[in-house]
């Protein structure tokens, strides 16, 4: 999670190094033994052209890209269109979606290219910009999840200590982005491009890597330890503690401000005097209990959804966080004989990071009724838009036929109405009393 290499959270650069390739691939020892064009063809065939399992990886990245982009945009649109959804929690969810959109657009394509080709094709400027934006989005996601947990903890466990408002939520979001942009500046400073094939640097950009360049060995270790603690371990521990207390309050204890009746599994209230009919006081007490039950259920649904979001985040970022620490702090994988296995681990870890961005909208869809309704409405509008032209053509084609049928129906209905009127009149006449029958017929 600390940069943009394959060792970094959603890294956007190559984890391989020249010593690794030299120890595992003989052709790199003596590239002068090959003609330049022949050597480049060999590199393309052996390293750059996607293998069978890499096509599966490409398909997985495409699916994640589409789901993450469409899903998170729908989340933002749903909250923007509906005023009743502009709650404090939903403001933070929108901010989380914006961070996911940022990392999906700016970093996912570059990571896929680097994972497949092991080459940074995007130049020195983007070598600094893309890793910086990626780490900023990671920091924004972590801080946003922390603010959500803190807000829910105050609202449920200590409702009288702090009152959260939409204005405070918006101010917190601005602070989150400012802090994230500032603390990730070192990541942009240390990123540099270098080539692993100096002899062919003027002829090809193959095996150009975008990696960190530090002045000493102690600095990268300190940086990555701090990055791991600040952006993963410490926030995760605090959020777990907060949600544990929330779980105890919502599922095991009485929520402050609720009655003991609700706490006792919502047993029905019994009036003291047992009146024959429900009195006004009893009705008001029952209404209050019903409101408390509704509030508890709503809080439980929200807490359950946020706990799942946190759990998925922790699972998706755990592999890359561990691999980064092992690589950067302990120097593992620098000289490895099983290069393909290490490459597979890092590649899968990168995909997991982006899969987290795609998973969040899916979680909202399954665990939030309001978001589910908005997603259905959005897809319904899309489907109606696709079939709108076909329906217009069919409607125009049926116009003449329907008009002819309408004319025939009107004539038929006119005849039927006339016959029905005659039948009703005759029936009413036949049911008249005998004494008045002659007079009625005469008057008619």
Swiss-Prot record:
GO terms for cellular component: nucleoplasm; plasma membrane. One of its GO terms (biological process) is feeding behavior. It holds the Pfam family 7tm_1. The chain crosses the membrane at residues 55-75, 89-110, 128-150, 171-191, 223-243, 305-326, 343-366. Residues 33-49 are annotated as: Required for response to orexin-A. GO terms for molecular function: orexin receptor activity. It comes from the Eukaryota. Nonselective, high-affinity receptor for both orexin-A and orexin-B neuropeptides. Triggers an increase in cytoplasmic Ca(2+) levels in response to orexin-A binding. This is Orexin receptor type 2. It comes from Sus scrofa (Pig).
């Amino acid at each position: 999670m600390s940069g943009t290499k394959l060792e970094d959270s959603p890294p956007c650069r190559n984890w391989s190094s020249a010593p690794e390739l030299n120890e595992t691939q003989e052709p790199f020892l003596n590239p002068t033994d090959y003609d330049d064009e022949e050597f480049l063809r060999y590199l393309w065939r052996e390293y750059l052209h996607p293998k069978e399992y890499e096509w599966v990886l490409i398909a997985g990245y495409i699916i994640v890209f589409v789901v993450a982009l469409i899903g998170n945009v729908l989340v933002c649109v749903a909250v923007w269109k509906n005023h009743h959804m502009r709650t404090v929690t939903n403001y933070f969810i929108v901010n989380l979606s914006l961070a996911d959109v940022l990392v999906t657009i700016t970093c996912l394509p570059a990571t896929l290219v680097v994972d497949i080709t092991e080459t940074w094709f995007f130049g020195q400027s983007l070598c600094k910009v893309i890793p910086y934006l990626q780490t900023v989005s990671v920091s924004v996601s972590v801080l946003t999840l922390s603010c959500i947990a803190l807000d829910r903890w105050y609202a449920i466990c200590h409702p009288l200590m702090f009152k959260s408002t939409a204005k405070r939520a918006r101010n917190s979001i601005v602070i989150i982005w400012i802090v994230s942009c500032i603390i990730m500046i070192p990541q942009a400073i240390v990123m540099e491009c270098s080539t692993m094939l100096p002899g062919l640097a003027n002829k090809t950009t193959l095996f150009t890597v975008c990696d960190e360049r530090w002045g000493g060995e102690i600095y990268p270790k300190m940086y990555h330890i701090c990055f791991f603690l600040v952006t993963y371990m410490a926030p995760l521990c605090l959020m777990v503690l907060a949600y544990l207390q929330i779980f105890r309050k919502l599922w095991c204890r009485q929520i402050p401000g609720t009655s003991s009746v609700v706490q006792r599994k919502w047993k029905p209230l019994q009036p003291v005097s047992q009146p024959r009919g429900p009195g006004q006081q009893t009705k008001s007490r029952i209404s209050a209990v019903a409101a408390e039950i509704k509030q508890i259920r709503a809080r439980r649904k929200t807490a359950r959804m946020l706990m799942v979001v946190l759990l998925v985040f922790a699972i998706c970022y755990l592999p890359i966080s561990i691999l980064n620490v092992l690589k950067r702090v302990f120097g593992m994988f620098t000289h490895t004989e099983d290069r393909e296995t290490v490459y597979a681990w890092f590649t899968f870890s990168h995909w997991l990071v982006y899969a987290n961005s795609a998973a969040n909208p899916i979680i909202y869809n399954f665990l939030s009724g309001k978001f589910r309704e908005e997603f259905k409405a959005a897809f319904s509008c899309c489907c109606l838009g696709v079939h709108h032209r076909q329906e217009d053509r069919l409607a125009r084609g049926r116009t003449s036929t329907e008009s002819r049928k309408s004319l025939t129906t009107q004539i038929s209905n006119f005849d039927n109405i006339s016959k029905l009127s005659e039948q009703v009149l005759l029936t009413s006449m036949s049911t008249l009393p005998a004494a008045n029958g002659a007079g009625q017929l005469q008057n008619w």
